[in-house]
Amino acid sequence: TYYANLIMQELDERNEPPSKTFEYINRFARFVAEHNGAAYECRVTHVPLTEQVRAVVLEPPFGSNITVLEDAKTRALLVIDSGFRCCARYTLRQLRTIFPDFDERKREMLLTHSDSDHTGLAESMPVIWCSQRTADCFANESLGLPSPREASATGLPYYRLNKLITEYAVPPLNRLRILNTSHGDDEQPISPIGAFLFGDMRFNVLQGNGGHVPGETMLIDPVHRVAFTGDDYINPHNMTPPQKEFDRLAPYLARSVNVDSPRYHAILRAVLAMLDGKGYLIFPGHGGVVQRTEAM
């Protein structure tokens, strides 16, 4: 009721009819209910990356892509982002079908950022890698403080309702492991903060300066030409019909998917300059994998 009242107050101040926004909230909740449970279907893509590592990408009807890297030698798994928490058991069911011994394997998670549509499997992961700023965000949330998206009066009610509808919970703080070996340079759109090893791959870990959300990170393997961009680059040209429908709802409710749109566009330009046309296999935060021969 409190957050609904905040929305009513905001709409009244802007002379906008509350019925329109609450209809979108109703459609958002109905969409989540109708595409969850037995109706939760992911587009699954299997992609070999190196002689030792392969990727399996799950694209749910709503929420972030869920990418699992598998090390053929050690059988270890790395889960990069993981959709919404309200879908967790159905995501796990699909992962256990692909990897029948999923629960027995060494498995870790890596979060590209703190948004609720990326953290859904956090409670099922023994280790969760993230940037220091992402960890700080979770620590603040655990104390009841607003996330970066809730810092504004306009963002607070919408994101709190989103979290309620999608059953968000702060990831377990005692499982967080920090990617940073340096702080990065916020004078630049993207800057290096460390490195991450998995199998025979070595990723440069880059951090954006807070365009999409503070703590946003990307993983770039320049040797094997593989990039995980989080939401600093998404692929709207190759989404499933449910994903497209959901994406039409979310920005209206949140007003913007970015904390700082000018910074986000500077980050996107830097990402395009670094990757586009250079033979990278690109795994976006949302939408299909961009093949090496495709333009971003």
Please report, for each region that a protein language model flagged, where it lies by residue:
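Active-site HxH/HxHxD metal-binding segment of metal-dependent hydrolases
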Residues: 96-186, 296
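Long amphipathic alpha-helical scaffold segments
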Residues: 1-49
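Conserved beta-strand hairpin/beta-sheet module of binuclear metal-dependent hydrolase folds
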Residues: 40-98, 217-235
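Hydrophobic "anchor" residues on beta-strands that sit immediately upstream
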Residues: 77-79, 108-109, 127, 227, ...
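Conserved catalytic scaffold of divalent metal-dependent phosphoesterases
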Residues: 130-134, 143, 194, 200-201, ...
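Alpha-helix termini
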Residues: 73, 96-103, 273-279
